[in-house]
Amino acid sequence: MDRVWRAWDGQSFKENQPESPSARGIVVSWLSRAEWEQVTVYLFCDDHKLQQYALNRITVWRSRLGNELPLAVASTADLVRCKLIDAAGTLGTDELRLLYGMALVRFVNLISERKTKCSNLPLKYLAQEVNIPDWIVELRHNLTHKKMPHINECRRGCYFVLNWLQKTYWSRQLEGSLKETWELDEDQLDAEDPEEEEREIIADDVLEEIPEPQDDDKDEELAVEDDANTKGNEEVASHPEPSSRHKELYEKARELLVSYEEEQFKVLEKHRHLLQAIKVWNNLSPRVQCILEELKSISWENRDAVLDAFLDDGFLIPTFEQLAALQIEYEDGQTEVQKGEVTEPNSHKNIDLNEVLVPKPFSQFWQPLLRGLHSQTFTQALLERMFSELSTVGSTGIRPTYILRWTVELIVANTKTGRNARRFSASQWEARKSWRLFNCSATLDWPQVIESCLGSPCWASPQLLQVVFKAMGQVLPDEEQEKLLRVCSIYTQNGENGLAKAIEGSSSSSTGKAPYTLDTLHEDLQPPGTNCESEESIQQKEQGNLKDVKQEEKKENEEEEKEEEEMEEEEEEEEEEKEEEEEEQEQEEHQEEEQEEEEEEENQKVFQDQMEADVEESDDVEEEEEVDDEEEDEDDDYDDDEEEDRMEVGAFSLAQGSSVFENTRTTSRKREALQGSAWQVSSEDVRWGTFPLGRLPGQTEDPAELMLDNYDTMYLLDQPVIEHRLEPQKSKSSTLSLCCGGSNTNSSSSSSSGNMEGLLWNQGQMHGLKAGLQLF
């Protein structure tokens, strides 16, 4: 045992040499005790930045001591680093399993390294000496020799080992007892009895207790089972361990839940207003996060212990003081008492589960913890436990009321969105939207939920089955659902009396149900007033004080329902108005498109008529020019001027029309001729009127975009020479004469021949070229 502790402290020893006071001095790598305490607190907090700072300090310690660093410090640093990498989400599942596995294997190997050098004991026994459970050793064995375990198993082992290290090493340092309890001489430990060693472990309150069976217990077991073999004796001896472990975890879970309630009520006392406290509750504090992580580790090891603690009075089942602190008035919820009417004990049969839900403040109180623990396995186990608890309690009181409410709340909260959720009532739908416990619903095993509900029949089983059928959807056919409902209603028709009879007749029936005889039939046919007068009087007294409270709550609920209905109607009206506006806009757009298409078709027809008329007129003019003589040149010039004007008008109309119906599918000959060339008409819907002349859509300021891709060079000597370019005086005089032709008729007539010789095109041809030229 001493070698194990010395291994953790990273020290060596000599067996036959007594240590002097001066030799007990230890060289440490931290500067002061304050630095050690700071690193201890930072390692086990929930702030990742502080944990990283603590890891950096341990790295500095390792650089100072090297291999002499205490093994507990090194193992803690490795495990905390694995947790930080896991929380960062930068690695995959396989890489995380390798990291966790390496850290856990090193932990188990290091605690047993010094001990295995001196003795050949199995690793399981060495781990039991320091209160490490067998499943940690088995996990190390699987990581080393067998198939890699699941990532959740690795995380569970990491959390447990960190908790073990915190208790057995770091807490001892903070208490200042490391030197007295861990550094014991080998001779002193050999002289001590096992009983004294147990007393020291119990007195420390740091190590997890694993009680060993006493001699008296062993004698009793041997007296009871004289003929049992050694294996049987081992099994009998191991039976008390799980029960004691379960009890220990149960007590620890209760302590954590009490701490959680204290933290939540502190927030409520600080803010006083419930709405502000609910907002703060949703933001988990570091202390609440620590409680949540510890509950997760306990749940991974023993889920039943956590469920038992949750369903104790004072937690999910509130006390009257807790309800008063949360400003919740207790309402039985099983009966609806009206004025002047007598409440019957069996009136809970008419309960409507559509309105049975957990009060919102109480639901928000436990929401952070339930959301953190939420998973398919945990939530389903909690539901099954509530079904079994509901079958054992009565039908009145605060415990059955809140078990039923939590059951309905869990079923509604785990319903997926869609048709299944729409089957719920308005209050349940609002509960799922605003009161739901979880951000995302877990896929529950609904057939298993039905089996649990039918396996624990109670007075509310038919109504609970209906809620389950609504939540799960079409998992079972409607006919099967109806059959199950009928069987359940027949089985639970005796109600409360049948439950009492079943409890009384449990001794005569192995299944816990009393046989149905003629006596029970006569008792059922008797009026309820003969047997239940005392019960009715008690219930009337209990419920007499709650009548006014219930009526006020009913009024408030009715007002809230009216407000909710008005809000829903307003939302529906707004949605209808939006839909109508969208439909009107679509109709207007459709009409505008039709009008534009009609206008485009009309413009096409007009354009084609104009083109045909222009072609016919141009043909007529050419024929007239061929027939006329030279004497009628002046008339021809006049006709040419008229043709030029017409062409200008046609070109102008063409420019206007092209901007309107560029996007239409025209089949004119002009477009067919241009199809495939660089001057073809674009089919894209581009509003050319918004672009200046010479500008293209998407064109930048870089002039290099307008350069040609392919071009040929032509030398100056190869260019054709035109004779009239060598006569600049004639061309100048001809242009001047054209400009001044209207003022002097003699000069125009004398220079007409010179004009025709110097110009390549006349004025009419120039106008035609301009009209036919299209940019882009």
From Swiss-Prot:
Compartments reported by the entry: Nucleus, Nucleolus; Nucleus, Nucleoplasm; Cytoplasm
Bias (Acidic residues) ranges: 185-227, 558-602, 611-646
Annotated spans, Disordered: 185-247, 501-646, 733-759
Task: Give the residue range of the signal peptide.
Answer: none
Q: List the keywords (alphabetical).
A: Cytoplasm, Hydrolase, Nucleus, Phosphoprotein, rRNA processing
EC number(s) for this protein? Answer: 3.1.-.-
InterPro entries noted in UniProt: Las1
Q: Which GO terms describe its biological process?
A: rRNA processing
Bias category Low complexity: which stretches? 741-755
**Major location category of this protein:** nucleus
| Extent of Basic and acidic residues compositional bias | 228-247, 544-557
* Annotated segments matching region Interaction with NOL9: 677-696
> What is a single cellular component term in the Gene Ontology annotation?
MLL1 complex
Q: Which GO terms describe its molecular function?
A: endonuclease activity
**Main EC class of this protein?**
hydrolase
Family to which this protein belongs: Belongs to the LAS1 family.
Q: How does it assemble?
A: Component of some MLL1/MLL complex, at least composed of the core components KMT2A/MLL1, ASH2L, HCFC1/HCF1, WDR5 and RBBP5, as well as the facultative components BACC1, CHD8, E2F6, HSP70, INO80C, KANSL1, LAS1L, MAX, MCRS1, MGA, MYST1/MOF, PELP1, PHF20, PRP31, RING2, RUVB1/TIP49A, RUVB2/TIP49B, SENP3, TAF1, TAF4, TAF6, TAF7, TAF9 and TEX10. Component of the 5FMC complex, at least composed of PELP1, LAS1L, TEX10, WDR18 and SENP3; the complex interacts with methylated CHTOP and ZNF148. Interacts with NOL9 to form an ITS2 pre-rRNA endonuclease-kinase complex.
Tell me, what does this protein do in biology?
Required for the synthesis of the 60S ribosomal subunit and maturation of the 28S rRNA. Functions as a component of the Five Friends of Methylated CHTOP (5FMC) complex; the 5FMC complex is recruited to ZNF148 by methylated CHTOP, leading to desumoylation of ZNF148 and subsequent transactivation of ZNF148 target genes. Required for the efficient pre-rRNA processing at both ends of internal transcribed spacer 2 (ITS2).
- List the protein's name: Ribosomal biogenesis protein LAS1L
Gene name in the database record? Las1l
